[in-house]
Amino acid sequence: MRRILAAIVGFILYLPAFPQQRIQPKNIEIVRDSFGVPHIFADTDAEVAYGLAWAQAEDDFASMQEPMLPVKNLMGRVQGKKGAAGDYAFALFRCREITEEKWNTLSPGFIKLAEGYVQGINAYARKHPEEVLHEKLFPISVKEYISSAVFALTIFNGADQALIRIFNNSEWEVPELNNKGSNAAAVNAGQTSSGETFLFINAHQPNTGSQAFYEAHLCSKEGLNITGGLLAGGPCILHGVNENLGWAHTVNYCDRVDEYQLEMNPANSLQYKFDGQWYNLEEKTVRLRVKGIPIAVKRKVYWSRYGATMKNKQGFFAIRLGANMKIGVLDQWYQMDKARNFSEFYAAIDKQELSMFNIMYADRYDTIFYISNALMPVRDASPVYN
């Protein structure tokens, strides 16, 4: 089915360093094939991102909204006690503050893309208020949107499990390996009977919800021409192929998270030792709103030089991981989308914003490549450290 988006008045969002350009929906074309996959065409990458947001929202707006709820402290209001844990974790891991602190590390081109995507989300929410999960969720700003991505990657990297262990006063246990998992392979042309280079992808994702792949084709006059999969709320392809190259992600199991028990000052219960000196824990009270409970529930969140810090019966524990230190993972995927050869692709992944995942790569020039990618610390190998 072929149609052109009707003109819709978008929200103009304020962004200090980079003034936004208002997207004109009439310049965007969404063509759905016989499978319902959207093929989105426009002059600029930002316009394509607007169209992608609109197409995703048409298909599953609820899943798109879910990762954004903690940004507005609304997950508890929508999902009850379980959701309130997400609101607490968002505050605990300081996703909003980290986004603000690292904002200038994002490329201007990506910021324009994100602006277009957010304008598309806000426009759809305004046009379809009956589909909005909570009346206070929209409009959402670009910085709020990026902070939601930081939170999602922080949780996906295992911070949620560390949080649960500390909350339950339980020790870390070696997990049993699951024999089921995603698969990917790249085969050089010299090893195939047809003389062609092959890239195989068999990603194991659920069929529904925010972790399900959403397939799309994005095409602009600024060099974006890629098809593949993304997760709910993604502004670009996270796993796919363009005219010149392709890549696959599978989950790897690198040790990306450290948990520290802090040595507290006997003379001051909110001071901890770091490099031989005592430092004050940063303390903040968050007000959690829970569906069905008329009053706010107050909880303390702490921050140390190690990172997000919690208190349990055994003392204070901090959670430290690379995913909670950077904000440019979507920017990196955007640069991967636009890469024309291995040199450009490697330059994109060399930014080291992606905190996990295997990367399997192949291109039309018969280059194949694999890396088990992660943001991991250089740890002290002595038993005392562990």
Predicted features and spans:
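Bacterial Sec-dependent N-terminal signal peptides
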Residues: 1-21
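Mature extracytoplasmic enzyme cores
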Residues: 21-386
